[in-house]
């Protein structure tokens, strides 16, 4: 009796399960049909709007009503973009608001070499930009500067009424600073030249002095960018940073540090004339982005030079200008470099000891170009991401002006470097230790190629994602090193970086990602202080372990790209990864995809004789379906193939490159 009851009960449950399964499949088929019907009825503009903002979803998993709501919401955001501060969809809203102004900025950047001396400006919500171009057609030298001011509180006159401590400058600097006592903008662009070093290790630079360089600086707070996604803490309101500035040590002038030091200054030399740009730093963190076209000599100085001052000369004027707090001369041979710089103190500057470490970033793009020959050979440029984090032992009391302390710092100098190469990215981690201060440096070199002016790179392109993945990995490694440092100190005060880094690299993936997550959380807590670091180059490699990557950090990189909050995205429109690297993910841009032909599927005629199944979703075509045809004549649902082509550049069926058939004109 009992066995029969159990058998009947089991059969009843099985039939109920099968019925539910059939009902679920039927509902999914209905949702798929409604999905395709919705896509078929969309105009080209509405389809691109939803596709570009990742609103299409997956067939069968989203209803047509939800799709319609997404479309209406996107249109509302687009219509209200001038003053929209809605938080309903921060990433999409921000992207829509910045689109028109970003396009105008990019158009100007694409043509600045032909425009001569031109100034352009624009406003977009709480962001304003001002760009100045200076071109010398005869010599081929050019320079430009760009200011992007971000004021989250919309306080245009934030600079007024602030206390500041002056930095001793030359007479020209003082005159220029007095001419601009108050500015309606919260931050200023720092423009300067890269001058060849005349120090002991930079004598080779004297042969190529005076390369005209335009600085391209973007100053702004990254509330929604690096400050959140990278786990970088925000600067507290009472604390400010000081941008490294040029001073004249021959007059005995030094940086004077007050309780709230806000002024910096730099020079730009062009055709023998020097102009100055004042840098004001408010209580918001800075992220300068500097673009310097130039050609200068090579400096082989190590990652930390013991003498704290480098003398520079100008070819035209010959005036000695000394740069405080910078420990190397920057070199670039037709290359493009990006430096993410972490905070550290200027030498000879009063400094308040910190009890914790702190991550602060600065991105610098430098584009090298030979000014001696217009027919110079094109070289594949490279990006260098230089991330640094420093830690001061708690309770350490130091007098920055003490000669004995500086002697101890030099005597306690210790360096070690670990190098690895993966996926076309050359990566180096260096460890620098002085008495009381420990610094970790993560340097990443990314191969790039300059694309033509007609080409357009999407902010969400694979190149940017790859670059930001490397940034994320670098921050994760530095944070992990800072986290394991106390434990390593307890075991051995003399432990070198290779031992710590090898321990991190050889750990399990789960442990690695856990370390990154905990370290990012630690770093995002209140850790103040430290000035902006000077530009530096990686030290010579000594070892080559293979470093593991944090998946959690990689995921965050994608979210940063999609949000479009990093100012580097504007510059990265001009770059793609080098064709020779081995990055496995390559897709087409949205413009290239849109240039492929489309049509509607018809049941009659030729279509009845051709294939009726989309090879991507394995679904039958229905009359009215929008199809996109590749140059190889294979066809697919438009939404299926667009998603495929965003990550791949080949046909899903024949695997032939899509752009090989003459579609390269799509740019």
Swiss-Prot record:
Molecular function GO terms recorded: DNA binding; nuclear androgen receptor binding; ubiquitin protein ligase activity; zinc ion binding
Catalytic activity: S-ubiquitinyl-[E2 ubiquitin-conjugating enzyme]-L-cysteine + [acceptor protein]-L-lysine = [E2 ubiquitin-conjugating enzyme]-L-cysteine + N(6)-ubiquitinyl-[acceptor protein]-L-lysine
GO cellular component terms given for this protein: axon; cytoplasm; nuclear membrane; nucleus; PML body
Keywords: Cell projection, Cytoplasm, Metal-binding, Nucleus, Phosphoprotein, Transferase, Ubl conjugation pathway, Zinc, Zinc-finger
Entry keyword Cytoplasm: yes
Modification Phosphoserine occurs at: 559
Highest taxon of the lineage: Eukaryota
Zinc finger (RING-type): 614-655
Pathway: Protein modification; protein ubiquitination
Comp. bias regions, Polar residues: 116-139, 296-327
Function: E3 ubiquitin-protein ligase mediating 'Lys-48'-linked polyubiquitination of LIMK1 and its subsequent targeting to the proteasome for degradation. Negatively regulates axonal outgrowth through regulation of the LIMK1 turnover. Mediates 'Lys-6' and 'Lys-27'-linked polyubiquitination of AR/androgen receptor thereby modulating its transcriptional activity. May also bind DNA and function as a transcriptional regulator. Mediates polyubiquitination of QKI in macrophages, leading to its degradation.
UniProt-listed PANTHER family: E3 UBIQUITIN-PROTEIN LIGASE RNF6, SI:CH211-59O9.10
Protein name: E3 ubiquitin-protein ligase RNF6
Source lineage: Eukaryota, Metazoa, Chordata, Craniata, Vertebrata
Gene name in the database record: Rnf6
């Amino acid at each position: 009796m009992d066995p029969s009851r159990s058998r009947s009960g089991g059969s009843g449950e099985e039939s109920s399960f099968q019925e539910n399964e059939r009902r679920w499949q039927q509902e999914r088929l209905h949702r798929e049909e409604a999905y395709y019907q919705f896509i078929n009825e969309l105009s080209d503009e509405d389809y691109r709007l939803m596709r570009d903002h990742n609103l299409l979803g997956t067939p069968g998993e989203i209803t047509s009503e939800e799709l319609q709501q997404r479309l209406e919401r996107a249109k509302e955001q687009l219509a209200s973009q001038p003053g929209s501060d809605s938080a309903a969809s921060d990433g999409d809203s921000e992207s829509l608001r910045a689109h028109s102004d970003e396009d105008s900025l990019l158009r100007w950047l694409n043509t600045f070499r032909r425009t001569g001396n031109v100034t352009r400006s624009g406003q977009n919500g709480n962001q304003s930009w001002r760009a100045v171009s200076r071109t010398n057609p005869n010599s081929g030298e050019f320079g430009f500067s760009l200011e992007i001011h971000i004021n989250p509180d919309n306080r245009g006159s934030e600079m007024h009424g602030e206390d500041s401590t002056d930095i001793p400058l030359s007479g020209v600097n003082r005159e220029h600073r007095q001419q601009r006592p108050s500015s309606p903008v919260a931050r200023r662009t720092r423009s300067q030249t890269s001058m060849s070093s005349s120090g002991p290790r930079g004598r080779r630079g004297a042969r190529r002095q005076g390369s005209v360089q335009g600085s391209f600086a973007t100053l702004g707070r990254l509330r929604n960018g690096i400050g959140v996604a990278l786990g970088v803490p925000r600067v507290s309101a009472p604390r400010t940073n000081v941008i490294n500035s040029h001073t004249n040590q021959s007059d005995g002038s030094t940086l004077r540090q007050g309780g709230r030091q806000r002024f910096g200054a730099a020079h730009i030399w062009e055709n023998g004339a020097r102009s100055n740009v004042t840098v004001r730093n408010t209580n918001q963190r800075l992220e300068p982005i500097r673009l310097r076209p130039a050609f200068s000599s090579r400096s082989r100085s190590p990652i930390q030079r013991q003498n704290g001052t480098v003398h520079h000369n100008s070819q035209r004027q010959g005036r000695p200008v000394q740069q405080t707090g910078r420990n190397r001369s920057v070199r670039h041979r037709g290359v493009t470099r990006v430096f993410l710089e972490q905070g550290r103190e200027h030498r000879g500057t009063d400094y308040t000891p910190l009890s914790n470490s702190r991550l602060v970033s600065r991105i610098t793009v430098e584009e090298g170009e030979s000014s001696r020959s217009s027919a110079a050979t094109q070289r594949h440029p490279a990006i260098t991401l230089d991330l640094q984090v420093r830690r001061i032992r708690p309770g350490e009391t130091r007098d920055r002006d003490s000669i004995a302390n500086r002697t101890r710092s030099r005597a306690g100098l210790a360096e070690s470097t670990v190098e690895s190469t993966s996926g076309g990215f050359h990566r180096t981690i260096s460890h620098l230790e002085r008495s009381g201060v420990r610094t970790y440096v993560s340097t990443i070199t990314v191969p790039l190629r300059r694309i033509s002016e007609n080409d357009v790179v999407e902010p969400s392109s694979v190149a940017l994602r790859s670059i930001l993945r490397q940034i994320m990995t670098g921050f994760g490694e530095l944070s992990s090193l800072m986290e394991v440092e106390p434990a390593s100190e307890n075991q051995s005060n003399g432990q070198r970086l290779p031992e710590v880094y090898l321990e991190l690299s050889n750990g399990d993936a789960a442990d690695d990602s856990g370390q990154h997550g905990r370290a990012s959380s630690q770093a995002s807590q209140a850790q103040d202080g430290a000035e902006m670091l000077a530009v530096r180059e990686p030290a010579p490699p000594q070892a080559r372990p293979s470093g593991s990557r944090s998946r959690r950090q990689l995921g965050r990189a994608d979210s940063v790209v999609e949000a479009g909050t990093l100012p580097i995205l504007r510059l990265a429109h001009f770059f793609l990864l080098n064709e020779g690297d081995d990055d496995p993910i390559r897709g087409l841009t949205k413009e290239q995809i849109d240039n492929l032909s489309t049509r509607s599927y018809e049941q009659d005629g030729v279509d009845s004789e051709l294939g009726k199944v989309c090879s991507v979703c394995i679904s039958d075509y229905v009359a009215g379906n929008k199809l996109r045809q590749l140059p190889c004549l294979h066809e697919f649902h438009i939404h299926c193939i667009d998603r495929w082509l965003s990550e791949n550049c080949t046909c899903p069926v024949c695997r032939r490159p899509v752009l090989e058939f003459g579609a390269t004109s799509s740019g």
